[in-house]
Structures are given as structure tokens and as C-alpha cells.
């Protein structure tokens, strides 16, 4: 895939909308448009890497440090019972967007994990409201 058609590259370059909750010089964290639960966050490198096989070690470590921080914040803000962190590599693993990303998903007791494609899109208003709550915690 050429980077010009990558939706996550477009989000990183502000050419597509996203409800951003965290940003630094290397990564961006924003709410998934098809959330498994409210607060479902994606963390991406700003630079295009297709999957974990391509990303430099220092960058993947940074992405996961932000993933840990995001998991703590999402759990606190949503009141979730737990957090699932998912990172898929390749079509066979379920990767749908071929730009490295990790999912930080709030989970509740007794809940099963559906396929991401079976989840309806959330409204931009819902995403922005949750993004504001999470952004506030990142500033603390």
C-alpha cells in the first residue's frame, strides 16, 4: 500500500478526522471509529510501518510504553474491569489496516471479543466526548 492511501498516515498528517487523545513526536493515540467498548483506543507510529516486522526496536518500545499509559488511563476513565491490548500482523492474523497499530480495549466481566468488522461505527460526537475525558487524564 502506498502511504498516500493509508488512512492512518492521513490521520497522522491531519488529512482525515480522528478523536486524538495523545500525541508526541513519534506516536499518535486516537479513539477507534468502530469501538469494541467506549474508550477503545488505537496507538500508531506517525511514520508508516506496515507491521511489527518492519518497525525499529526503540519505536516499538515507545509505542508499548504509551500503550501501557493509555491502558491505565482508559481503565480509570471507563471503569472497565480489564484491558485487552491487541496488535495484529498480516492478513492471516486479522490485520485490516496495514499501518502498525495497537488496540487498547476496555473490557468487562463476561464479555466476549467480537470481530472488529462486526462493530458499527461510533458517532464523531461520541468519540470526541470520550477523547476529551481521556485527554484530560494524559495531562495529569
Task: Kindly label every feature range from the protein language model.
Residues 1-140:
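HIT superfamily nucleotide-processing domains
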Amino acid at each position: 500500500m502506498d502511504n498516500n492511501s493509508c488512512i492512518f498516515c492521513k490521520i497522522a498528517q491531519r488529512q482525515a478526522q480522528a478523536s486524538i487523545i495523545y500525541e508526541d513526536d513519534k506516536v499518535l493515540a486516537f479513539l477507534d471509529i468502530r469501538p469494541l467498548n467506549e474508550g477503545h483506543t488505537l496507538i500508531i507510529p506517525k511514520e508508516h510501518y506496515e507491521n511489527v516486522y518492519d518497525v525499529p526496536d526503540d519505536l516499538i518500545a515507545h509505542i508499548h510504553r504509551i500503550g501501557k499509559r493509555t491502558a491505565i488511563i482508559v481503565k480509570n476513565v471507563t471503569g472497565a474491569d480489564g484491558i485487552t491490548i491487541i496488535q495484529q500482523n498480516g492478513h492471516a492474523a486479522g490485520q485490516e489496516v496495514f499501518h502498525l497499530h495497537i488496540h487498547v480495549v476496555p473490557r468487562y466481566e463476561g464479555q466476549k471479543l467480537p470481530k472488529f468488522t462486526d462493530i458499527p461505527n461510533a458517532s464523531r460526537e461520541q468519540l470526541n466526548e470520550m477523547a476529551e475525558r481521556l485527554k484530560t487524564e494524559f495531562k495529569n
